């Protein structure tokens, strides 16, 4: 068995004296693990850092085996990301989200999204929005996607302001007004194609929204707790955002 693909490093763990087991999200083969011989060498350690884009060749006798990775660097982002608390927490959070998905289950859209985020993860004004949208995409990949395209009551695509905690569907400001205290606020930048301004309060609403559905559909049923990196990421982003509005 052999395949060739691009990947983004999620993490490694030590294996023996000189090797590591590499975990990467790939373009066509999903989240995949493999042994990298000599992965702890001075040459390979900088390559195998989280956030780096790499060229991967995987070989194994049988498909179900761990297999061996041959790794070549394509884009070394880690040195830049390690200088930012937002980026450090962010890459940990993104990796934790991807580990919720079945191993080797292809998600090319998430791979491409992660590549875009990695390029901006040390930019707090942009990173918060990108990660919030990524969380929506992960929920969708897990089968728990939210319907934010139109109002569940009226069918309107305009002035969507709330999300029903029961159905995960959007509701307009007018239709939701009588039940506003029971609905979740919907930040406008989460609706398709919307580039609305946002501030700390609005970004907090976005993460409260995605966090609610992660807890209900993923963490609680699986007996998991929210990744610690999530609170760390949000706090680091907030420290760099103004109180008023900021462009995404």
UniProtKB/Swiss-Prot annotation:
One of its GO terms (cellular component) is bacterial nucleoid. Keywords: DNA damage, DNA recombination, DNA repair. One of its GO terms (biological process) is double-strand break repair. InterPro entries: ARFGAP/RecO (IPR037278), DNA_rep/recomb_RecO_N (IPR022572), NA-bd_OB-fold (IPR012340), RecO (IPR003717), RecO_C (IPR042242). It comes from the Bacteria. Pfam families: RecO_C (PF02565), RecO_N (PF11967). Involved in DNA repair and RecF pathway recombination. NCBIfam families: reco. This is DNA repair protein RecO. It comes from Chelativorans sp. (strain BNC1).
